[in-house]
Amino acid sequence: STAEVQLAAQSTIPNRDFVLDFRVAGDTVKSNLMTYEDPQSGQGYFTMMLYPPTGHESFARQPMEMVFVLDCSGSMNGQPLTQAKNAVSVALDHLQEGDTFQIIRFSENSTQLGARPLPATKENIRIARKYLARLHGTGGTQMIEGIKAALDFPHDESRLRFVSFMTDGYIGNELEIIGAVHDRIGAARIFSFGVGSSVNRYLLERMAKEGRGAVAYLGPQDSGEDIMANFFGRISHPALTDLEINWGGMAVSDVYPAKIPDMFVGRAVVVTGKYLGGANDVSVSGYRGADRHEMTVNAADDSNKAQVSRIWARLRIADLADRQAWQQDPHGELENSIRATALEYQLMSDYTSFVAVDTSQQTDGEYGVT
């Protein structure tokens, strides 16, 4: 079935991205594979979308290894740190038998609750709350120490490892932090929680994206209980993890994102790329607990959907910008690629913009107007 969506107010100026919120019917993963071939060049483009169901009731809960990393620097002192500690305390209530957890604090250095993740027993949770109560904000922000402490210890492969950073993100070495996440992420997922009224969104969003996670914000008036309940509801019942795509005979290239994220309730997975020589159905597989599930995504030829190529271009630009964040760009090669892609596909970017040119003619006469 199809639906047509348009702006209700015809006079609305479309000067920003259009966002459509919708719910997926049913309790199974839905999929769509749009393809388009440029009639001049023959270059093919595709966009594949995987939609999880609205609720997580049909997915079994997975054992988790939760690592809470708290920024205890001076900029977090007061209400932000209190909110972060309360959010972690609420999160501890959502742990179940079979889960493990760790708490790491950092400022100018890092310390942690235990030498290794602890089983989520009542006694260990009581000890964790006493540890939280003693934390206070002071000193500088050496987030790199928190990154190393959270990602360097061995991973228990029987559990999904989620690393939750609670921070305002105010540091001076953003590129080093993002590079460290890229180099050390392994099988972990990073979820960034921006705490306070003014946070470093650039850093938090880049960390979450590089860590195949997501970002959330905990403002002064927000409820840590609601945010953590929503967070645990999603991550403890993943629709599919460790996704892999079998392209069959489809000759694909330049596929984005380079790291395919897990599929959680409330977050679709979008993969786009180029192809040559025709499109075909593809197979997507991933883990749901210990079991591997596979599904077929049918290709649909949308010959009148030239915007599929622009979706590819937008995700390519986003990928190049992410690489700039951790790889840096001393010779400007990534910048040039972003600019060239944006110009070819007529898109806004950090290096291109739209310019309105008035083509109207001035009338004759001394008092002519345009």
List each language-model region with its residue ranges.
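Flexible loop/turn segments at secondary-structure boundaries
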Residues: 55-57, 75-77, 110-113, 171-173, ...
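Generic structural signal for secondary-structure transition and capping sites
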Residues: 100, 137, 237-240, 347
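Short, charged loop segments at secondary-structure junctions
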Residues: 61-79, 86-89, 93-99, 104-170, ...
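An acidic, Ser/Thr-enriched
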Residues: 1-69, 192, 221-222, 241-370
